[in-house]
């Protein structure tokens, strides 16, 4: 029997137990703790062997406080008995007897001899806190590690400066997708940016669920999450995916691209295989649509965007939200408010995709939930009475039709191949249980009859095409169409304005003016101005709205109505009578302006102003004609005489698109406009001074009146 005895400082964590040892600590008095063979001198050790077992060892340690620790190592002969290895640690701490279990630092060799090693560092905090600390040290932000530690466990974040962002290729409800280049591998990737408002824990958990689901899935037809980009100080996160050149919606809507039956079978087969993998892992995608089905240059299809995905358990029903799946691909049970559903919601969306690939357009494009449900009932029929009773859907009483709808899927898609039509009939069943599973769909005649599904690599190669590209082109085409429409309307108005009476006409009837009121919604109500006539013209941006209400014009250009819109005036000429509304500008011998020029009556639709032009004239003079006794009229007439000497037109025609000509002040071009503004400012100052003088005069008169009344005793 060997005995090792050493004296010194007592360690705290020396003795740990493993599965083959028992640790017992007993505190006894010094004179009882020392074995007989232990030497009396300090810092000295010797070994002894037992005739019965040479593999038993003692170890004793003591410190300056005369406390000793004796360790007895007793290995087990596995052939003779089944007892576990025991280790007794005797420590002198006090007279109290203490038993405890500790982790061990003993490493058992091949010969079953226990040798004491340096104790390993152990975590003294909880597992979650320890993992959180390790994740923060690895570079993850604390707000993410504290809420979504499971999602990032075992990963190290990538740095944003290791990627080069190229362009935006997608926009979703909760995120944006960018095309980027990985500078470390020089490969193209897709970065899905998720930003959190105020680090809301719920939104972080929502994003973490997507990451956990993506890490659980591993299939060739499912997008693989390759990494995450974030930092300790970042408020957003990027999910790194493989870059895919196309999505199914972009290709299907491209003019000139028609899918063959074998090609459609190839895409649908890959889609169903990917869904089968998701459903076998207990995952519902809940947003199957063309833009989420991505294709690479070899026509390999992968399901993407698991932002709305969730876990489900088939045998344990759990309430789920019904506000999922894009409206055009949403099944009727979700529109009716069901919270107890399963894989059949993805199968309904798959049926919509199948029919869309054959027809080339969405089959049920509803704008609202009510309209979408109505389209479903018209195409697929309404559920049976038994289904209404058994399902107990929340919105059943609201949306249940009084008369049942007849199913007409076969009549609507009669041009489809019979095998495809049969599969569409199954997948678009109104009652969820009749839709089958992904496995049953893959075993249907659609995939087993000729022509068989093509190999993805044998399909045609296309230019990169995504749904966002299609939308951008549609918006551009719509903008061009609107622009051309505006130009055509402007030309039509210009042709109509040539029928306006000549300047020597005596008057224009009230009926004619009222007829013209209906044109106030046109882009322009002005004629092309004749450069030989006595008026100026400015190039002005077109009206955003053709209707101007409550607008008052000053100085013949424009004014701002109560809604903040500029009200532009016309530039065609009209008879002399209508110029009674503009006496402060020109004298009667001057050429007349348009019946629309400086007149709000025809713009705001005020019949009172048209029938009573004197009322408008008096109103205008009361508001604007009091400044300095008509000095404005005299100055503008002088400028007008100077302007008539010029034979060349100062009309700026420019490009016709989105431009219009409106009458302006009767002044010549150049610096005279600045002089007019200065004169305007001077008149304002004079008016303010006059008002002050009048106010002081009125105060003096009031004081004299009061003094007079007081003197008379009144």
UniProtKB/Swiss-Prot annotation:
Biased composition (Basic and acidic residues): 471-498
Disulphide-bridged cysteine pairs: none
Biased composition (Low complexity): 16-27
Record keywords, A-Z: ATP-binding, Kinase, Lipoprotein, Myristate, Nucleotide-binding, Serine/threonine-protein kinase, Transferase
Lipidation (N-myristoyl glycine): 2
Sequence segments annotated as region (Disordered): 1-64, 471-579, 693-714
Positions with a binding annotation for ATP: 169-177, 192
EC number: 2.7.11.-
Highest taxon in the source lineage: Eukaryota
Active site positions: 287
One Gene Ontology term of the molecular function aspect: ATP binding
Biased composition (Basic residues): 31-46
Top class in the EC scheme: transferase
Matching PROSITE patterns: PROTEIN_KINASE_ATP, PROTEIN_KINASE_DOM, PROTEIN_KINASE_ST
Domain Protein kinase, chain residue ranges per copy: 163-447
UniProt feature, compositional bias: Polar residues: 506-528, 556-573
InterPro entries, per the entry: CDK, Kinase-like_dom_sf, Prot_kinase_dom, Protein_kinase_ATP_BS, Ser/Thr_kinase_AS
Family named by the database record: Belongs to the protein kinase superfamily. Ser/Thr protein kinase family.
Identification of the protein by name: Probable serine/threonine-protein kinase At1g09600
Species of origin: Arabidopsis thaliana
């Amino acid at each position: 029997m060997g005995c090792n005895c050493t004296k010194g400082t007592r360690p705290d964590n020396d003795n740990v137990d493993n599965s083959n040892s028992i640790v017992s600590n007993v505190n006894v008095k010094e004179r009882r703790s020392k074995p007989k063979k232990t030497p009396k001198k300090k810092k000295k050790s010797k070994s002894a062997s037992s005739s019965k077992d040479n593999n038993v060892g003692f170890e004793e340690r003591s410190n300056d406080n005369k406390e000793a620790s004796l360790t007895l190592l007793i290995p087990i002969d596995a052939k003779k008995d089944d007892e576990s290895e025991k280790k007794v640690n005797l420590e002198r701490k006090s007279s109290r007897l203490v038993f405890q279990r500790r982790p061990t630092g003993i490493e058992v060799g091949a010969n079953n001899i226990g040798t004491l090693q340096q104790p390993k560092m152990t975590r003294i905090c909880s597992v979650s806190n320890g993992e959180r600390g390790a994740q923060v040290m690895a570079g993850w932000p604390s707000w993410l590690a504290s809420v979504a530690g499971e999602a990032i466990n075992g990963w190290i974040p990538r740095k944003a400066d290791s990627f080069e962002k190229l362009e935006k290729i997608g926009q979703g409800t909760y995120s944006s997708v960018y095309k980027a280049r990985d500078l470390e591998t020089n490969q193209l990737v897709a970065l899905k940016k998720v930003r959190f408002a105020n680090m809301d824990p719920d939104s972080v958990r929502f994003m973490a669920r997507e990451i956990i689901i993506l890490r659980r899935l591993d299939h060739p037809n499912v997008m693989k999450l390759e990494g995450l980009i974030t930092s300790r100080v970042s408020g957003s996160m990027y999910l790194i995916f493989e870059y895919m050149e196309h999505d199914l919606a972009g290709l299907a809507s491209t003019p000139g691209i028609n899918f063959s039956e074998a090609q459609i079978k190839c895409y649908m087969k890959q889609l169903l295989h990917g869904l089968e993998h998701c459903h076998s892992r207990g995952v519902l995608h809940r947003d199957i649509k063309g833009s989420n089905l991505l294709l690479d240059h070899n026509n390999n299809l992968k399901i993407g965007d698991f932002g709305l995905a969730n876990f489900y358990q088939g045998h344990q029903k759990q309430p789920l939200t019904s506000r999922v799946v894009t409206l055009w691909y949403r099944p009727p049970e979700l529109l009716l408010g069901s919270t107890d559903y399963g894989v059949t919601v993805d199968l309904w969306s798959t049926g919509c995709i199948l029919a869309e690939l054959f027809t080339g357009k969405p089959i049920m494009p509803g704008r609202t939930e009510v309209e979408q449900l109505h389209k479903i009932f018209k195409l697929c029929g309404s559920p049976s009475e038994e289904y209404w009773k058994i399902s107990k859907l929340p919105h059943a009483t609201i949306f249940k039709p009084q008369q049942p709808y007849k199913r007409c899927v076969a009549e609507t898609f009669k041009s489809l191949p019979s095998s495809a039509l049969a599969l569409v009939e199954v997948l678009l069943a109104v009652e969820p249980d009749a839709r089958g599973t992904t496995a049953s769909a893959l075993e249907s005649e659609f995939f087993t009859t000729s022509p068989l599904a093509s190999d993805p690599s044998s399909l045609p190669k296309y230019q990169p095409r995504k749904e966002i590209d299609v939308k951008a082109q549609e918006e551009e085409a719509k903008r061009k169409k609107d622009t051309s429409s505006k130009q055509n309307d402007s030309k039509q108005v210009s042709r109509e304005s040539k029928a306006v009476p000549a300047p020597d006409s005596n008057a224009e009837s009230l009926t004619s003016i009222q007829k013209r009121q209906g044109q106030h919604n046109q882009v322009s109500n002005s004629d092309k101005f004749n450069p030989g006539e006595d008026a100026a013209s400015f190039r002005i941006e077109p009206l955003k709205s053709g209707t101007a209400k409550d607008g008052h014009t000053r100085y013949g250009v424009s004014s701002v109505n109560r809604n903040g819109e500029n009200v532009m005036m016309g530039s065609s000429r009209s008879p002399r009578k209508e110029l009674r509304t503009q006496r402060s500008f020109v004298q009667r011998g001057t050429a007349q302006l348009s019946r629309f020029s400086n007149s709000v009556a025809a713009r705001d639709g005020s019949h009172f102003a048209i029938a009573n032009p004197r009322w408008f004239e008096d109103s205008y003079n009361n508001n604007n004609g009091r400044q300095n006794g008509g000095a404005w009229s005299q100055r503008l007439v002088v400028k007008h005489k100077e302007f008539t000497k010029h034979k060349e037109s100062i009309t700026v025609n420019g490009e016709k698109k989105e431009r219009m000509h409106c009458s302006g002040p009767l002044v010549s071009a150049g610096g005279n406009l600045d002089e007019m503004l200065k004169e305007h400012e001077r008149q304002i100052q004079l008016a303010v001074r006059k008002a002050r003088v009048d106010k002081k005069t009125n105060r003096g008169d009031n004081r004299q009146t009061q003094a007079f009344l007081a003197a008379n005793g009144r």
